[in-house]
């Protein structure tokens, strides 16, 4: 102990000597409790929506965007906020991850958009919680399959229309894979389908026995041997069609190596190869057996229908996606067959005249029993054999039934995916049709607007030859009223003055009638007069703003009388909204060729309420409504004039 003290005591004394000058000086003040910068509140603005959180909350994950110093690039010094131009609904789930440590996947959001948000904020998909992980993976897998199908559809020609400068290979491949693109492709589609059916039917019919010439006894032989020339010509025509189709597909394929390795390409080769081998091989007894074997492969032509049947394609995709389940089923059946065949052989070995002569011979009984077929050609006779046969039958039911739900679910999933793909293609066609219709409608509206005088020639500028004519709101309402009246009355109204000239020619003062019609005012020596029924009841007059005339309250929006020419026989349509121009002039001509229609415009009366009610100049209680036309020499009432009073 003493040695230990002697060892460290010199160091303690030296330290005390070194501290002595510092001890003579006053100690600094004790540090006060000061708020740490890590506890400050940060404001995060995501597309206008403000989120507030503690800085320590974001610092929990320094490897992410919000937890590292990289977020300072998004700091706005003026507002004191971190601004992100991202989806605020997605950010709510991201911020909850910083708070709780568990990342949840929103069901109502797109899974691809969610992955993009996670990648932006530096979060990996493995952080998704266990409660949402399975659904997240299923949705992501389904989205990946959909994108792969869309990409395959674009490559095979089911996608959008090809551009104008497409090559002949692209157009030909699109016609093969999507026959509905053109009439020629559809015709070729049905022709190949017809020859496939003819080839399969001929392959079946040529084996039917046919009777030859009348002999005693009658001799029967297959139809293929009875009529060899007819079946040979039929087979030759089918093979030529199949060969031409295969060569054209090989020429038009985007990737020839990939096409040669495809299943459908192998089916095409197997379907046409036996014919050419039969032409090259001599017909003798030595090679007749091999030739007959090759003729069996002609039955594979029936698989060519898979190009014409969506159900067969779905079945093929289902079997391909269930390869692991089918492999498990085959492995389980193989094990069960070997086990039960061995047991049945030794159980029936001691009996006489037994069919279970060997273990391979017992395979047939085991396969038939496990698949619940039960032909009855091999049956056990001992009690042990019957017991093990019953166990074999029950085991087969269980082994076969286990993978069936998985296969059915995959078939249903692929079927619904194809339905959604067909629906998307139909919606895309409808959308493109609507776009074309909208473009056509926009063009027609522009031409109609130009035809109606909405555009005027601007000769001063070279860049813009046509410009929009400036119209007042009252003038637009004037033409709108004309258009509505033409639709409701089936008459066409012609104008004799431009709208501005018609307004300038009508004077608001010097009224001699209580009528509210502009046409009842004298505007010239040769003008025709039109009036409505006189107003004999006294009304309170009001004064308009910026006007010296008073207007009765009942005549503010009243349209008294309207005269229009009846249309000539023909289509009840109007070529122009605001004009019926001369025959020698274009529709988009100068404004002097367009004149305003005679329409009763509400005009303030000049008399006071206390004055008497004079009659209209037309005389009588009801004045005749006429049409002003500058081309008529004298005032007259046209025989085809239509009068619409007090609309």
Curated annotation (Swiss-Prot):
The modification Phosphoserine is found at residue 555. It comes from the Eukaryota. Detected in carotid body chemoreceptor cells and in frontal cortex. The chain crosses the membrane at residues 184-205, 231-252, 264-284, 288-308, 324-345, 387-415. Residues 2-20 are annotated as: Interaction with KCNIP1, KCNIP2, and other family members. Residues 1-183, 253-263, 309-323, 416-647 are cytoplasmic. One of its GO terms (cellular component) is postsynaptic membrane. One of its GO terms (biological process) is protein homooligomerization. A-type voltage-gated potassium channel that mediates transmembrane potassium transport in excitable membranes in the brain. Mediates A-type current I(SA) in suprachiasmatic nucleus (SCN) neurons. Exhibits a low-threshold A-type current with a hyperpolarized steady-state inactivation midpoint and the recovery process was steeply voltage-dependent, with recovery being markedly faster at more negative potentials. May regulates repetitive firing rates in the suprachiasmatic nucleus (SCN) neurons and circadian rhythms in neuronal excitability and behavior. Residues 510-520 have a biased composition (Low complexity). The gene is KCND1. It catalyses: K(+)(in) = K(+)(out). It is a multi-pass membrane protein. InterPro entries: BTB/POZ_dom, Ion_trans_dom, K_chnl_volt-dep_Kv, K_chnl_volt-dep_Kv4, K_chnl_volt-dep_Kv4.1, K_chnl_volt-dep_Kv4_C, Shal-type_N, SKP1/BTB/POZ_sf. The transmembrane segment S4 functions as a voltage-sensor and is characterized by a series of positively charged amino acids at every third position. Channel opening and closing is effected by a conformation change that affects the position and orientation of the voltage-sensor paddle formed by S3 and S4 within the membrane. A transmembrane electric field that is positive inside would push the positively charged S4 segment outwards, thereby opening the pore, while a field that is negative inside would pull the S4 segment inwards and close the pore. The zinc binding sites in the N-terminal domain are important for tetramerization and assembly of a functional channel complex. Most likely, the channel undergoes closed-state inactivation, where a subtle conformation change would render the protein less sensitive to activation. A motif (Selectivity filter) lies at residues 372-377. Residues 521-530 have a biased composition (Polar residues). Pfam families: BTB_2, DUF3399, Ion_trans, Shal-type. Its main location: membrane. Belongs to the potassium channel family. D (Shal) (TC 1.A.1.2) subfamily. Kv4.1/KCND1 sub-subfamily. Residues 360-371, 372-379 dip into the membrane without crossing it. Keywords: Cell membrane, Ion channel, Ion transport, Membrane, Metal-binding, Phosphoprotein, Potassium, Potassium channel, Potassium transport, Transmembrane, Transmembrane helix, Transport, Voltage-gated channel, Zinc. It is found in: Cell membrane. Component of heteromultimeric potassium channels. Identified in potassium channel complexes containing KCND1, KCND2, KCND3, KCNIP1, KCNIP2, KCNIP3, KCNIP4, DPP6 and DPP10. This is A-type voltage-gated potassium channel KCND1. Residues 144-164, 510-531, 564-584, 601-634 are annotated as: Disordered.
């Amino acid at each position: 102990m003493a040695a230990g003290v002697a060892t460290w005591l010199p160091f303690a004394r030296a330290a005390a000597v070194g501290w002595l000058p510092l001890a003579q000086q006053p100690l600094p003040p004790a540090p006060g409790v000061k708020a740490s910068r890590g506890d400050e509140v940060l404001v995060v603005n995501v597309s206008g929506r403000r989120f507030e959180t503690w800085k320590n909350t974001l610092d929990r994950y320094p490897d992410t965007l919000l937890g590292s110093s990289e977020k300072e690039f998004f700091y706005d010094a003026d507002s004191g906020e971190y601004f992100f131009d991202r989806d605020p609904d997605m950010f709510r789930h991201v911020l909850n991850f910083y708070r709780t440590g568990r990342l949840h996947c929103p069901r109502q959001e797109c899974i691809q958009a969610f992955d993009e948000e996670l990648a932006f904020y530096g979060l990996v998909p493995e952080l998704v919680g266990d409660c949402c992980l399975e659904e997240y993976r299923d949705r992501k897998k389904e989205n990946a399959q959909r994108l792969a199908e869309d990409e395959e559809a674009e490559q095979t020609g089911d996608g959008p229309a090809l551009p104008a400068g497409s090559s002949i290979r692209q157009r030909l491949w699109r016609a093969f894979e999507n026959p509905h693109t053109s009439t020629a492709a559809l015709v070729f589609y049905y022709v190949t389908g017809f020859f496939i059916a003819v080839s399969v039917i001929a392959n079946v019919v040529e084996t039917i026995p046919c009777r030859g010439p009348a002999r005693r006894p009658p001799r029967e032989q297959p139809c293929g041997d009875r009529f060899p020339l007819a079946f040979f010509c039929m087979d030759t025509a089918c093979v030529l069609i199949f060969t031409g189709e295969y060569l054209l597909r090989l020429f038009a394929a985007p990737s020839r190596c990939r096409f040669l390795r495809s299943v459908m390409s192998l089916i095409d080769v197997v379907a046409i190869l036996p014919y050419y081998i039969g032409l090259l091989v001599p017909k003798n007894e030595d090679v007749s057996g091999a030739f007959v074997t090759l003729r069996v492969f002609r039955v594979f032509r029936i698989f060519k229908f898979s190009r014409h049947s969506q159900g067969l394609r779905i079945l093929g995709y289902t079997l391909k996606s269930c390869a692991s389940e089918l492999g498990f089923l085959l492995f389980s059946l193989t094990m069960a067959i070997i086990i039960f065949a061995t047991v049945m052989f030794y159980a029936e070995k001691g009996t006489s005249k037994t069919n279970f002569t060997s273990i391979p011979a017992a395979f047939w009984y085991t396969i038939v029993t496990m698949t619940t077929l039960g032909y009855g050609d091999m049956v056990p006779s001992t009690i042990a054999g019957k017991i093990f046969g019953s166990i074999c039958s029950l085991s087969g039911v269980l082994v076969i039934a286990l993978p069936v739900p998985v296969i059915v679910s995959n078939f249903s999933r692929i079927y619904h995916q194809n339905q959604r793909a067909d629906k998307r293609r139909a919606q895309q066609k409808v959308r493109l049709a609507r776009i074309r219709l909208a473009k056509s409608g926009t063009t027609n509206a522009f031409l109609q607007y130009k035809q109606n005088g909405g555009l005027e020639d601007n000769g001063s500028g070279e860049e813009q030859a046509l410009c929009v004519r400036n119209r007042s709101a009252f003038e637009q309402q004037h033409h709108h009223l004309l258009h509505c009246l033409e639709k409701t009355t089936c008459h066409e109204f012609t104008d004799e003055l431009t709208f501005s000239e018609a307004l300038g020619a009508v004077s608001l003062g010097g009224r001699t009638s209580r009528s509210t019609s502009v046409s009842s005012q004298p505007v010239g020596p040769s003008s025709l007069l039109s009036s409505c029924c006189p107003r004999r009841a006294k009304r309170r007059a009001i004064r308009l703003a910026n006007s010296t005339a008073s207007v009765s309250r009942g005549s503010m929006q009243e349209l008294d009388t309207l005269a229009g020419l009846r249309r000539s026989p023909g289509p009840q349509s109007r070529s122009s909204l605001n004009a019926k121009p001369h025959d020698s002039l274009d529709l988009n001509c100068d404004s002097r060729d367009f004149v305003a229609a005679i329409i009763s415009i509400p005009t303030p009366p000049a008399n006071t309420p206390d004055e008497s009610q004079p009659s209209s100049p037309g005389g009588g209680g009801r004045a005749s409504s006429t049409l002003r036309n500058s081309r008529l020499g004298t005032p007259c009432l046209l025989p085809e004039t239509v009068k619409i009073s007090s609309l």
